[in-house]
Amino acid sequence: MLESLQPESELLHDEPDPGEKVYECDECRKTFSLEQHFVEHKKTHGGEKSPECTGCGEEFSKASSLTRHLRSRSRRESYKCGNCGRTFSQRGNFLSHQKQHAEERPSESKKTPVPMTTIVRNQRNAGNKPYACKECGKAFNGKSYLKEHEKIHTGEKPFECNQCGRAFSQKQYLIKHQNVHSGKKPFKCNECGKAFSQKENLIIHQRIHTGEKPYECKGCGKAFIQKSSLIRHQRSHTGEKPYTCKECGKAFSGKSNLTEHEKIHIGEKPYKCNECGTIFRQKQYLIKHHNIHTGEKPYECNKCGKAFSRITSLIVHVRIHTGDKPYECKVCGKAFCQSSSLTVHMRSHTGEKPYGCNECGKAFSQFSTLALHMRIHTGEKPYQCSECGKAFSQKSHHIRHQRIHIH
């Protein structure tokens, strides 16, 4: 459900992944991202040959045997660093490692690794096409097409968007990207009417309606509608955190997490409430805050009727009824219903206190605790007693005081 809430810009990378396998049916030209799905589809045409692995050519008597073989190959397939010889079983980890060498030698070309199975498949499909890529074996009819393709491997991006400065390896990707700025959304979903600037994003969106999740984690079996979500998820198993803060050295698994963290150091709070003037570091916090003024709570729990201003809050609330606690501490085993609670809890083990007071230097494990502490310096007391007018800096102190009037 959460995946359906992602902004369109996060749904798909604009450029194709040279390491991602695509299987095309000779009968109907339908394409598949996973070979297991491709093998199952071939059965629908009937009279198929013995199932064969496109990577090594081995034939099998049953499709299930081929499926087991493919899983075994996937586990064994590794990426070897040409600079230091280190091998990786996951492509994402390999790419992160390659960045370290790229930073050491920024002038050198940054080539993307290609799995051997992709090279073998491309060579088989070459046919009579005379121009073949030396990196991945893919062949083309024209030399110009080959040159365009090679930019994927070299990292060359000569086509730059004059609106935002983002660069692309091929002109067609720039043209597709420019729809983001123009506001054009020609691709519309027949199910719900939502429109997209790129056809690929529509295809991914439609999986929300069909329930298709072609990208499965080999570690825990969890499936995703897009490859980028799987890559981010796999970091929860590997512990990989490729994005590091230059100020304090803290590492993050996602680039967006690093971007938000960096605002702590620069003190940036660009989002201001027009009603009361409160400022926020993130737009999502401002939107959530706005509901205090409007009182709007459009998302209601089917179990108890409690309403929420955000659908994500409803999803977390429903876990109270289901007992689902998907986020578990690897140190002590304590489980939580939301990831933010686990993040805060982990600091009790690590002793990390990332939120520091600019006035006195005192540090805190939670931003909310820092916000309360800051009122000591500012003198802010937002909670006022309606009976006697006495004001308090904290809500808990206000509630405790009100008991005096009740008794």
From Swiss-Prot:
A zinc finger (C2H2-type) spans 23-45, 51-73, 79-101, 131-153, 159-181, 187-209, 215-237, 243-265, 271-293, 299-321, 327-349, 355-377, 383-405. It comes from the Eukaryota. GO terms for molecular function: DNA-binding transcription factor activity, RNA polymerase II-specific; RNA polymerase II cis-regulatory region sequence-specific DNA binding; zinc ion binding. Induction: Up-regulated by activation of alpha1-adrenergic receptors. SMART domains: ZnF_C2H2. Expressed in both embryonic, fetal and adult heart. Also expressed in lung, skeletal muscle and adrenal glands. Residues 1-21 are annotated as: Disordered. One of its GO terms (biological process) is regulation of transcription by RNA polymerase II. It is found in: Nucleus. Residues 10-21 have a biased composition (Basic and acidic residues). Its main location: nucleus. Keywords: Activator, Developmental protein, DNA-binding, Metal-binding, Nucleus, Repeat, Transcription, Transcription regulation, Zinc, Zinc-finger. One of its GO terms (cellular component) is nucleus. Binds DNA. Interacts with GATA4. Belongs to the krueppel C2H2-type zinc-finger protein family. This is Zinc finger protein 260.
